[in-house]
């Protein structure tokens, strides 16, 4: 099926099959479609609403075309990632949580990019922290195998995305591609916490990952609108485990934490996010630093559970709390900076 036929179907509010979606996505991602066609396709898909079959097809093509990171083992390797677009401009919770995971001995293959609508994307934060981003897949694998954490800069691993960049930018709206990033980890992780910008996406994306072979995933959206677990409101979870999907709400109190306002956790820049994270991961904390630490503990705990590194969400949160207060997570961030600096010298020689 070519994109013109697909557009005719979509205008008629008809879904594409998984295979038809694969064909159209392959045309888009290999430069066979005009920008007008891509923009029309993305807008039509949004107005129709993307089906699970269509998302599965799109994800499978992006994974196929990605520059992959080959790890010695995927057992227990986790990613904690969000779609973004929640409008809250909270500091980089998932990226900070990744260093707590690594300090706990849980390997992390972190996938991320620069900010699109927010103030600080994961790549922006890590760059502000002095971490070199332009790594080869082999170098990323060495980071994960040696330190227990590595960062995969999305634009380096999904170069085929450049064909859709113009239409996406000019549309200025959330499209299918906003959902695809968290589902296309170049290391092929089977354990994830995926934050989404709308509760209605939780179950569908859990079903997509179920069909694509994921093992243990939490797809989450908080009642106060965050694409992660919130301290200020209940969080809705669609959990994929043992091939089954269950849905439930989680209150901070269910996990031994206290509900509190998120006031003071919004940031205006990557540097501000880094300063708050340094405060949160350090031994002495300001009031906002303590609150940020609890937000990190909540989300890192969920990822420890998704990685099967903890037996329950509550046990994961307890472990994350203990690890964060050792100061080892901040040390892990500094280790990654030093480790990648060597690769920078190699790559720029």
From Swiss-Prot:
It comes from Pseudomonas putida (strain ATCC 700007 / DSM 6899 / JCM 31910 / BCRC 17059 / LMG 24140 / F1). InterPro entries: Anthranilate_Pribosyl_Tfrase (IPR005940), Glycosyl_Trfase_fam3 (IPR000312), Glycosyl_Trfase_fam3_N_dom (IPR017459), Glycosyl_Trfase_fam3_N_dom_sf (IPR036320), Nuc_phospho_transferase (IPR035902). It catalyses: N-(5-phospho-beta-D-ribosyl)anthranilate + diphosphate = 5-phospho-alpha-D-ribose 1-diphosphate + anthranilate. Keywords: Amino-acid biosynthesis, Aromatic amino acid biosynthesis, Glycosyltransferase, Magnesium, Metal-binding, Transferase, Tryptophan biosynthesis. The gene is trpD. PANTHER family: ANTHRANILATE PHOSPHORIBOSYLTRANSFERASE. Pathway: Amino-acid biosynthesis; L-tryptophan biosynthesis; L-tryptophan from chorismate: step 2/5. One of its GO terms (biological process) is L-tryptophan biosynthetic process. GO terms for cellular component: cytosol. Mg(2+) 1 binds at residues 94, 228. It holds the Pfam family Glycos_trans_3N. Anthranilate 2 binds at residue 168. Anthranilate 1 binds at residues 82, 113. Its cofactor is Mg(2+). This is Anthranilate phosphoribosyltransferase. Its EC number is 2.4.2.18. Belongs to the anthranilate phosphoribosyltransferase family. GO terms for molecular function: anthranilate phosphoribosyltransferase activity; magnesium ion binding. Mg(2+) 2 binds at residues 227-228.
